[in-house]
């Protein structure tokens, strides 16, 4: 690194328990060269990492999150395991599910200029990140399978079908239990409206 440069890291507190077993990963080759060190450490699975990032990209629409999505599409892509993890994060999210699946796109130009431009080795224009955002929404809605849709609707009904996704410990996840408690407190008319909006978004 150049003299006088600095590295900023973010510590993220995660309320949500992991969906898949952790993995041990080595520091990538480029970072080993840049920082002149080697590290191997246990991490969340790729599906858990990107499942949460997908929700963040749809919710905040921050250029950093959209850049991560661009890297995902350029490498692993939206795998079935990653998509399943995303569905669980989506079901656990504070925002209504239909709002993340069909988001109102924000103008990110100012945030891009003030909080992202110059952060990456490869210059990525704001237009490319907006294209990634559109692709993310399209890919998710096109590829959600019947079991994933059924699980999301069952959560919104307050009658979870825990076996729908084939993930063993879903009923033990605190975030899902908290979401179900909140749904249970909703007035019946509002819950019905929210369910109908989700079903419409999912084309059910």
Language-model features, listed with the residues they occupy:
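Compositionally biased terminal segments of proteins
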Residues: 1-204
């Amino acid at each position: 690194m150049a003299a006088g440069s600095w590295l900023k890291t973010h510590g993220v507190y995660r309320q949500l328990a992991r969906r898949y077993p952790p993995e041990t990963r080595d520091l990538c080759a480029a970072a080993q060269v840049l920082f002149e060190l080697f590290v191997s450490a246990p991490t969340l699975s790729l599906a858990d990492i990107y499942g949460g990032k997908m929700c963040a990209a749809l919710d905040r629409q921050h250029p950093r999150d959209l850049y991560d999505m661009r890297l995902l599409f350029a490498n692993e892509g939206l795998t079935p395991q990653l998509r399943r993890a995303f569905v669980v994060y989506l079901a656990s999210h504070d925002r209504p599910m239909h709002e993340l699946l069909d988001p109102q796109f924000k103008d990110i130009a100012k945030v891009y200029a003030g909080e992202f431009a110059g952060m990456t080795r490869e210059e990525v224009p704001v237009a490319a990140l907006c294209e990634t955002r559109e692709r993310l929404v399209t890919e998710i809605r096109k590829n959600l399978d019947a079991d994933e849709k059924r699980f999301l609707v069952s959560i919104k009904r307050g009658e979870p079908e825990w076996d729908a996704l084939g993930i063993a410990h879903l009923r033990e996840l605190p975030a899902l239990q908290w979401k179900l408690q909140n749904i249970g407190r909703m007035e019946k008319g509002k819950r019905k409206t929210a369910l109908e909006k989700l079903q419409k978004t999912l084309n059910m």
